[in-house]
């Protein structure tokens, strides 16, 4: 619902074959990890392989399979999470970064078997910093 603030400007990092960027919750209320259904990280038109994606929040790192059942870790609108994936990018260069998020909103029921889900994307250009 607030897609223009998903990517934190100036947070693109590269560490060998991996790239990472800080992201913010595009929703106005906190969500448990189980509501983070998926993400996509694309830099300069190249998308990180889904199996390489990792999500870090509250000091812990997760695969999206691990998040699927996680109700103990919560993502708050005031906190940044880190999305990383296998993308070998050049440090000290400008890159176009796109992050896509799919979130489930558990308290908005839209049918007998379904809750609201939102798909949001944000693109920003920023310089990568070596980790």
UniProtKB/Swiss-Prot annotation:
Cofactor: a divalent metal cation
Stated pH dependence: Optimum pH is 6.0.
Recorded GO MF terms: lyase activity
Signal peptide (UniProt feature, chain positions): none
Temperature section of the record: Optimum temperature is around 40 degrees Celsius.
Assigned keywords, A-Z: Carbohydrate metabolism, Lyase
Annotated function: Carbon-carbon bond-cleaving enzyme which participates in the metabolism of C-glycosides. Acts on the C6-glycosylated compounds 3''-dehydroisovitexin (3''-oxo-isovitexin) and 3''-dehydroisoorientin (3''-oxo-homoorientin). Shows weak activity with 3'-dehydromangiferin (3'-oxo-mangiferin).
Protein name: C-glycoside deglycosidase beta subunit
Organism: Microbacterium trichothecenolyticum (Aureobacterium trichothecenolyticum)
Gene name in the database record: carC
């Amino acid at each position: 619902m607030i897609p223009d603030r998903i990517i934190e400007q100036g947070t693109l990092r590269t560490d060998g074959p991996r790239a990472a960027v800080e992201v913010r919750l595009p929703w106005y209320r906190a969500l448990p990890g189980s509501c983070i259904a998926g993400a996509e990280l694309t830099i300069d038109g190249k998308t990180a392989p889904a199996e390489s994606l990792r999500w870090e929040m509250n000091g812990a790192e997760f695969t999206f399979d691990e998040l699927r059942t996680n109700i103990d870790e919560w993502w708050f609108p005031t906190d940044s999470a880190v999305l990383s994936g296998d993308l070998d990018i050049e440090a000290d260069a400008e890159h176009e970064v796109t992050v896509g998020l799919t979130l489930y909103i558990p308290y908005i029921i839209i049918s007998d078997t379904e809750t609201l889900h939102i798909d949001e994307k944000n693109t920003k250009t920023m310089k990568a910093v070596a980790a």
